[in-house]
């Protein structure tokens, strides 16, 4: 499998997709066309999303084709040279992907070796479920089941504490609730500016910040970039 699962598309004060572009370029080396899934877009159109991603990936010489333009999106996925799923609202994304039969189609392609790039919601749907998203459930998908390309859950945009003056639950408290109900599942708190790359049977944390790991019965712990992540495979 070849996966590049990115926490967030854009760092504060930077251009769209600027910080992950070098790694995306290395990951997609030799790829000329990518099939894009824009269904996480809610307050802007799929066409606008496609245009935004195309503007950035054109720097790599990659053409973007969005599944929203296809009469048969699943067929477009089956024929894809590479796949890309953008961020936005995870529930909207999952609902549309399920309706179009894309969850299973994407998993088959990933297992066949097709490169997959996702950020934020696009990383969430690569997991077994979407249960560790940060998003509001604005629509109801058929289920919480997702692509299942990896065996663990990701919480993108992971924050260590709440903003000053905020009295609600921390992200860690919410994840601890999840593992209480799902004791066999690992959860990776993927901080902004970081990503996970899965290639050649190896999982690697890329970025300048550690990743926080959670599992029932264990104290949460930090994993540094370059650490052995084979326990997640």
Predicted region positions:
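C-terminal and late-domain segments of enzyme folds
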Residues: 1-30, 41-51, 132, 136-233
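Short, well-ordered alpha-helix to beta-strand connector turns
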Residues: 31, 80-81, 113, 150
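Catalytic-core regions built around general acid/base machinery
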Residues: 79, 99-113
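Catalytic nucleophile loop
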Residues: 84-87, 110-129
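Portal/gating segments that form or line small-molecule/metal binding sites
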Residues: 33-36, 41-98
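Short, active-site-adjacent cap segments at secondary-structure transitions
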Residues: 43-44, 90-91, 123-126, 195-197
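General beta-strand structural signal in soluble alpha/beta enzymes
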Residues: 5, 65-67, 85, 117-119, ...
């Amino acid at each position: 499998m070849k996966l590049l699962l990115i926490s967030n598309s854009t760092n504060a004060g930077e251009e769209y997709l600027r910080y992950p572009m070098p790694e995306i370029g290395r990951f997609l080396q030799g790829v000329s066309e990518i099939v894009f899934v824009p269904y996480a877009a809610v307050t802007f159109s799929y066409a606008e999303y496609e245009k935004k991603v195309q503007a950035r990936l054109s720097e790599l010489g990659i053409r973007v084709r969005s599944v929203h333009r296809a009469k048969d999106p699943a067929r477009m996925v089956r024929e894809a040279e590479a796949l890309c799923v953008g961020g936005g609202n995870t529930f909207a994304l999952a609902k549309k992907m399920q309706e179009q039969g894309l969850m299973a189609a994407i998993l088959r392609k990933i297992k066949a070796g097709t490169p997959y790039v996702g950020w934020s919601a696009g990383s969430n749907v690569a997991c077994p479920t979407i249960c560790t998203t940060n998003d509001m459930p604005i629509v109801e998908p058929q289920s919480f089941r997702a692509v299942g390309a990896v065996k663990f859950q990701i919480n993108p945009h992971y924050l260590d504490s709440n903003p000053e003056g905020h009295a609600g639950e921390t992200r860690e408290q919410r994840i601890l609730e999840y593992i209480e109900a799902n004791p066999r599942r690992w959860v990776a708190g993927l901080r902004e500016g970081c990503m996970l790359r899965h290639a050649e049977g190896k999982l690697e944390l890329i970025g300048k910040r550690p990743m926080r790991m959670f599992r029932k019965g264990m104290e949460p712990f930090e994993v540094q970039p370059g650490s052995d992540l084979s326990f997640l495979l």
